[in-house]
Amino acid sequence: MIRPALRTDWTLEEARAIHALPFPELMHRAQTLHRAHFDPTAIETASLLSIKTGGCPEDCGYCSQSAHHDTGVKATKLMGTEEVLAAARRAKAAGAQRFCMGAAWRSPKDRDMDRLCDMVRGVADLGLETCMTLGMLSPGQVARLKAAGLDFYNHNIDTSPAYYARIASTRTMEDRLETVEQVRRGGIKVCCGGILGMGEAEEDRIALLVTLATLPAHPDSVPVNLWNEIEGVPVQGRAQAVDPFALVRIVALARILMPASVVRLSAGRTEMSDELQALCFLAGANSIFVGDQLLTTGNPAAWKDRDLLSRLGLHVAPARARPPVAAD
């Protein structure tokens, strides 16, 4: 199958028109492009661990880990390397191909970089792909993580540029985009997506994807999150459940605008029926988090995911070969 050239010049008008297509036509276009770039029966699996929880100085209105909100989440110190590696071994045994490590920071301190790099090297030595989400990074920190063997860096933009100011004030959309570009220029694969269900309009969801699809290069991985009900955060008062078909349309639009990117169903799968997840896979989603816990929210039990993939005739995608990491 011929793969159409990837575009980074999408317009909001084009995206609106695609999003509004009759459902069968939208699904057909998304599935056609999905098949051009991926095995449509293969699902990538990742596991996520909070290596430093709570006490974050940012005021993101959706987040239970912000120090600005009374959510009952207790701040912890950065975990030790051996504790992280033990969790990575469990994740691999449970079927994860990628191990993602998240810290609730505005940005990592230089004093923590040695330990973070040790974590990356240790996880890579287990044969897992490595991913981190640590907040904003300096060019020097990007270089150190790259040298340690970090495969992916997650830094979501959360929502549309127009709606962003209603979500956070301590970090701007421009800050987020600069971090994404910093990571890309440093040679680390970019994981960047957003969150649905925070009171945003349909237009904001479309604009979120257009923002990602018009970056200098598409993110390698695009996580699609549903906001989880969290007590004590500002978003709680205006959050609205996302219509199931609206979610599928967004997944399909992500696949069409960014056909070579992995599209991950991330937070919120506990609220999705098996039928909804199946439609999302048909629309082009091809990755999930496995394990009972994400950062501070739940996730479907491993047996449920195995059962769902089996019933759909899907399989876990084979792990990609990792390039050798140069010694320090």
Curated annotation (Swiss-Prot):
Q: Highest taxon of the source?
A: Bacteria
Q: Which GO terms describe its molecular function?
A: 2 iron, 2 sulfur cluster binding; 4 iron, 4 sulfur cluster binding; biotin synthase activity; iron ion binding
Q: Give the EC number.
A: 2.8.1.6
GO BP terms = biotin biosynthetic process
What pathway, per the record?
A: Cofactor biosynthesis; biotin biosynthesis; biotin from 7,8-diaminononanoate: step 2/2
> Which cofactors, if any, are listed as required?
[4Fe-4S] cluster; [2Fe-2S] cluster
According to its UniProt entry, the function of this protein is described as: Catalyzes the conversion of dethiobiotin (DTB) to biotin by the insertion of a sulfur atom into dethiobiotin via a radical-based mechanism.
What is the official name of this protein in its record? Biotin synthase
Tell me which species this is from.
Cereibacter sphaeroides (strain ATCC 17023 / DSM 158 / JCM 6121 / CCUG 31486 / LMG 2827 / NBRC 12203 / NCIMB 8253 / ATH 2.4.1.)
